[in-house]
Amino acid sequence: MQWEVVIGLEIHTQLATQSKIFSGSATTFGSEPNTQASLVDLGMPGVLPVLNQEAVRMAVMFGLAIDAEIGQHNVFARKNYFYPDLPKGYQISQMELPIVGKGYLDIPLEDGTIKRVGVTRAHLEEDAGKSLHEEFNGATGIDLNRAGTPLLEIVSEPDMRSAKEAVAYVKTIHALVRYLGICDGNMAEGSLRCDCNVSVRPKGQAEYGTRCEIKNVNSFRFIEKAINTEVRRQIELIEDGGKVIQQTRLYDPNKDETRAMRSKEEANDYRYFPDPDLLPVVIEDSFLNDIRATLPELPPQKRERFQAQFGLSVYDASVLASSREQADYFEKVVSIAGDAKLAANWVMVELGSLLNKQGLEIDEAPVTAEQLGGMLLRIKDNTISGKIAKTVFEAMASGEGSADEIIEKRGLKQVTDSGAISAVLDEMLAANAEQVKQYRAADEAKRGKMFGFFVGQAMKASKGKANPQQVNELLKSKLEG
């Protein structure tokens, strides 16, 4: 039997406010336990929450960016459940009237196509505290620094049909919230966490299968692995005659398996009701218009512009537009070098590889956009070849200066004098007389393969400095002669 995978995601984004959503406590990551917890965060009697307007502004900004309905009358509700790191015994969230309603995201896929994924809603809520198990020898410590940190929970429609589509969706959200400046997107620190709702059904069946939720997955790689692992588990279970039970599960990356955490709750299990301590939030048109006027050019628009203006593929444009800093870097390189496709290749491949090796973000790149643009100019005017450019790039990354300084200092200027190249070729061909003889006796198919050998020998003899185009032209003439 053929199976279809159905995936919906809930993404918790920690909003980049300076203080918590209902108190004035700071939200700095990594502070000493319980040093950023006020009486409001601790749920002490007699204290009242006060809504942080900046959190509202950020939520509205996100809603406008995904072309969503904005709940201009939205209500906070109490979500009642017991957990040791939830001091009030309830979490302030939103249920029936969220701040952001239906919207959508267009996500770029690996095959160059664009898929539209619906967003059901996005609502504001407070984060819970954190349970600490390892430091207390069989006991559990509670750190309430995180309690009350503002979250925007983004709930998708079950529109994704593979783990790769799910990862593409999360990457699109990740890029968007960073563009907007509403979340730093640091998954390692928990700023962006994902719950994956996964089910399977026979191909062609309209009814959804029983879903399981995988909680708190915090990396793109683990999202893909967790979903694929859970899909395999469900299919094997059904094919063995079993039945999928609706559960909340955890993914164990060390064992590459999901395991049951608890039975999956429904909304009525939490006994939601409007929070009597918080008035309904009324959002005026003027507030919306002010926020709309501050929206930057967003990844989808930037991607489309890169395609139209620079002739880039959907994939290349999507990668380059995936972060604001990378897009700015690329455009600066293009403004200097004047060749978008060459710039895209160097930014994505050579610079990307360098940053990955050194564990750096693009705004920490050891090669500036001005330096890279200057080097690409030297490729375009034939001062250096593409191969020599890699040597120049490595030298720039090591702090040896600009491309022009390195080319001059190391004597890397490309040889374009036809006479000098011809002399190198004559010497190389004389040293490979037997291969020349074989080439001339060969048919066209074999000649094509052998020609590459001679080009390689010529570039080796010139120490990579000979102009490749001139080498090809002169070499062909000499071999055919």
UniProtKB/Swiss-Prot annotation:
Keywords: ATP-binding, Ligase, Nucleotide-binding, Protein biosynthesis
Gene Ontology biological-process annotations: glutaminyl-tRNAGln biosynthesis via transamidation; translation
UniProt xrefs under Gene3D superfamilies: 1.10.10.410, GatB domain, N-terminal subdomain
Broad EC category: ligase
GO molecular function, one term: glutaminyl-tRNA synthase (glutamine-hydrolyzing) activity
Reactions it catalyzes: L-glutamyl-tRNA(Gln) + L-glutamine + ATP + H2O = L-glutaminyl-tRNA(Gln) + L-glutamate + ADP + phosphate + H(+); L-aspartyl-tRNA(Asn) + L-glutamine + ATP + H2O = L-asparaginyl-tRNA(Asn) + L-glutamate + ADP + phosphate + 2 H(+)
UniProt xrefs under SMART domains: GatB_Yqey
Keyword ATP-binding appears in the UniProt entry: yes
UniProt keyword Nucleotide-binding present: yes
Enzyme Commission number: 6.3.5.-
Any Pfam family hit: GatB_Yqey
Family annotation (PANTHER family): GLUTAMYL-TRNA GLN AMIDOTRANSFERASE SUBUNIT B MITOCHONDRIAL AND PROKARYOTIC PET112-RELATED, GLUTAMYL-TRNA(GLN) AMIDOTRANSFERASE SUBUNIT B, MITOCHONDRIAL
Self-association state and partner proteins as the record states: Heterotrimer of A, B and C subunits.
Function according to Swiss-Prot or TrEMBL: Allows the formation of correctly charged Asn-tRNA(Asn) or Gln-tRNA(Gln) through the transamidation of misacylated Asp-tRNA(Asn) or Glu-tRNA(Gln) in organisms which lack either or both of asparaginyl-tRNA or glutaminyl-tRNA synthetases. The reaction takes place in the presence of glutamine and ATP through an activated phospho-Asp-tRNA(Asn) or phospho-Glu-tRNA(Gln).
Family affiliation: Belongs to the GatB/GatE family. GatB subfamily.
Descriptive protein name: Aspartyl/glutamyl-tRNA(Asn/Gln) amidotransferase subunit B
